[in-house]
Design a protein with these regions (language model features):
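Formylglycine-dependent sulfatase
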Residues: 1-334
Length: 334
């Protein structure tokens, strides 16, 4: 019997930020997933940027083969993805939420989309539309303004991610005849660095400055310095750290919701279940004076990757003995 599969893909989650990680965060659902499955602790993104990483993951091709190096590039409609293969094998391939497709093809092998994306699907978006959608957070979606608004409060990221999980739960409450391959895409814990107030205050109490937060290392090259936010006050760095941890904990809660709904769904169907979690890239969160991705520092390029369920060994951590990446052969062996 074909297993039902759910892949939960977050955006910009550095795996150092989790329970037991270098930067501890309360992530009980991710910890349970790791205990019950196989975690790849040396997993890396093929490119520390959203669209190149995601298209590499779907196609199994590195960015230098896809030709996708920026968030404005488009995966050709003629490029097959593992979703095409799964649909051919009889699966209903469902996208719930984010994937950051650019261009007219908003499927690339998905036979169904249940919730919209967070970001634009084209190359131009009117400024007034952005301001209407994101309000005071409009500029914080970009690298050079991502720390202009930080702290605890209402966030379009949190609102969007909650909507995605609502849509997933509604979809899983319905009967489906075909085997299911469901990809859940959230935008968190991507900046803006604004978390639910209670989570922000929780982590602000213990927030610490990264050792390299001032970014004055003499060996940084011109590209790395171009990514820096110079002269950032210490309290802003601490607020970014606290908000990012709060966003990670919020994402962990969504992982728990997704897994609980998926377990009920597969139990009702009497089918084997496979659940996976990963992110497209990480976030330096102020280390070396850099926020977000686009650098090859460890917190930017390492990603969480863990699978549990049918056919997956439990309690098997792969810690640093060999590396893997999200553009490797794993999607094509699902």
């Amino acid at each position: 019997m074909s297993p039902d599969i759910l892949l939960f893909i977050s955006d910009q989650h550095a795996p150092q930020y989790q329970a037991g990680g270098q930067m501890p965060v309360d992530t009980p659902n991710l910890a349970a997933l790791r205990e019950q499955g196989t975690a790849f602790d040396a997993a890396y993104t093929p490119c520390p940027l959203c669209v190149p990483a995601r298209m590499a993951m779907l196609s199994g091709l590195s960015p230098h083969h896809t030709g996708i190096f920026t968030n404005n590039d488009t995966l050709p409609q003629t490029t097959p993805t593992f979703l095409h293969a799964m649909a051919t094998a009889g699966y209903e391939t469902v996208l719930v939420g984010r994937m950051h497709f650019i261009g007219p093809d908003q499927r690339h092998g998905f036979t169904r989309r249940v919730a919209p994306d967070f970001t634009n699907s084209g190359w131009v978006r009117p400024q007034k539309t952005l301001e209407q959608d994101f309000g005071v957070h409009t500029q914080t979606m970009g690298y050079k303004w991502c720390i202009d608004v930080v702290g605890g409060g209402a966030s379009p990221v949190v609102c969007y991610d909650d909507m995605v999980l609502d849509a997933l739960e509604q979809y899983l409450a319905q009967p489906h005849s075909k085997p299911q391959l469901i990809v859940v895409g959230t935008y968190g814990p991507h900046f803006p660095y604004v978390a639910p107030p209670e989570l922000f205050l929780k982590y602000l109490k213990t927030a610490q400055l990264p050792a390299t937060w001032q970014g004055n290392e003499p060996w940084l090259n011109a590209q790395q310095r171009n990514l820096q936010e110079p002269n950032t006050r210490a309290e802003i760095v601490l607020a970014c750290q606290a908000a990012y941890k709060g966003l990670v904990e919020h994402t962990d809660g969504l992982i728990g919701r997704a897994r609980a709904a998926f377990d009920v769904f597969t139990q009702n169907r009497g089918t084997p279940a496979l659940f996976g979690y990963l992110s497209d890239h990480g976030d330096t969160v102020g280390e070396h004076g850099i926020y977000g991705k686009k650098s090859f520092f460890e917190k930017s390029v390492r990603i969480p990757m863990v699978f549990a369920g049918s056919g997956v060994w439990a309690l098997v951590p792969h810690k640093g003995h060999s590396t893997c990446q999200s553009a490797g052969p794993w999607p094509h062996r699902v």
